[in-house]
Each structure stands twice: as C-alpha cells, then as structure tokens.
Amino acid sequence: MKHLIRLCTVLCTALWAYSVQAQELDLRDSTRYLALIDSSFNAGNKGDYSGAESFLKKAIELIPQHPTNIYLLNNLGGVQQLLGKKEDALDSYSKALKRQPDNATTRFNRARLYALTGKHNAAVTDYSLLIAKAPSNELYLYQRAMSYMLMRQYDLAEHDLKTIVEHNGESLKARLGYGLLETARGRYNEAERIFDYLVTKLSTNADVYEGRARLYLARRMKGYALRDMEKAFELSKGKPSPTLLRLRAEINEGLGDKHSAEKDLRHAEELEKHYLN
C-alpha cells in the first residue's frame, strides 16, 4: 500500500541514531514506542486506517522529540488522506516539514494535497521549493505547470513545460501538458494536433484519451468526447481516477443522462478521500 511506507532503512537508521538518547528514557516508553509503530503498520495493512492513525498519534505523543517522528508524521498524513481527513493530513505534513524542511517526499506529498484541495498558490510554493533543489525534475515541473494552468497563469505553465522539453526533448508527458494547456487557452486546432500525435505514441495511455475527451467537450463535440472517455475507462482497467469520473459526469450531464452523471460524481467524491493526483 503506497501511502503506508514501511520506513525500512530510513526508519532503522533513525531508531539506531536515537538509541544513545533512548538510554536516558524509561525503557518501557521506548519499547511501547516501537510497539505502537509496529501496530500502526499492522493496522494499515489490514485496511484499518483509523487504527493506524490512532497508533501513530500515540507513538508521536509518547516521545514527542524522537527524530523518527518526522517519518511518522509523513505516514500519519498519508493515513489521514486515506480517511478523507485532508486538513488533518496537511497539518501532519506541515509539522513534519517544520522539523525537516528539506524532506522532498513530505513536501511533494503536501504539494499534491494542496493541489487536490484547490489550494494552488500553496501547491506552487511547495513545488517551487522542490524545483529549486532539482531544477530538471520532470514530475515537479509538470505538476507545477498544471497548477499554474488551473490558476490561468498560462505563460508560467508554458515556461515549465518548455523547461521539461529542454531537458528531455522526447518527453511525452510535456506534450500531454501542452495539449491540456492549448485546450485551456482555446487553441483547439493545435491541441487536437498534439493529442492525435499522442494517441499514436501512447495508444494504451488513459490520460491521453482523457485529455482529448476534454478537448472534444470544450469544442462541444460530446459524442467524440464520450467515445474517448469510454476508451480511457477501458484502459484504466476498473480503477478510474476521480478526474476521469468527474469528466464523464460532465459529459453525461451534457448528454442529458443525469442519473449516470450523479453516480460518477458520488464515485469520484468517494475516491477523492483516498486519492493523490
């Protein structure tokens, strides 16, 4: 389960580094601390996210200054996302970053959650800090470009996509971003050219068909949009993203199928409790 990272070497190293200090602590607290961490993993692996959250909180509260708490707070944020507690998750990530500002994993997790909750200014700030440390990281640049695009700061979005291409001229991810950007700008002919090219290169990629469906919907070509949407669902193999469901809901609403639209919206809302975009 990707949201519950068994801290592996990092956790073991942190625990070892703390062992000298632990000698000054009550041995029972140290033993209980480790037991609570183990219980949190066991609960999470069984799908008991409320239990995992409770065990992690108890471990952090038991020894508040333990250096491993940085990683436990990141895990706590992931568990809280799975529970749909997005604001609590943001608070957990922020507490972890206050202790270790350079932790890229936690900052990326917070940036994605900011974007998921529509807080794109905050997301851009986190992505910018990540990019300052890794200027050519394609994932960071792409995600910041998408936040810029949703903020209608199209020139800044284009700049990030251009940076990706400068470092990787064959990047299909950047081309997908350009297709979405040109659609948002209303440059539909250029967007269609990009998506048609991507379909030939990434014929089994659901994101490409979802992107072209957005284009067709913007051009009021609902039949074509629905065709690409169904292809995207087929390629998602029963695991559609919330954005895919919301887009199909929008298409079905436009076609007058309100029942299907409402069903997809409910499904999207349920998935968003657990989803990182």
Over which residues does each language-model region extend?
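Short coil turns that delineate tetratricopeptide repeat
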Residues: 64-67, 101, 135, 169, ...
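Register position in tetratricopeptide repeats
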Residues: 45-46, 82, 116-117, 150-151, ...
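TPR alpha-solenoid repeat register
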Residues: 69-72, 106, 140, 174, ...
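N-terminal leader/linker segments that initiate helical-solenoid repeat arrays
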Residues: 20-73
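Canonical tetratricopeptide repeat
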Residues: 71-75, 109, 143-146, 150, ...
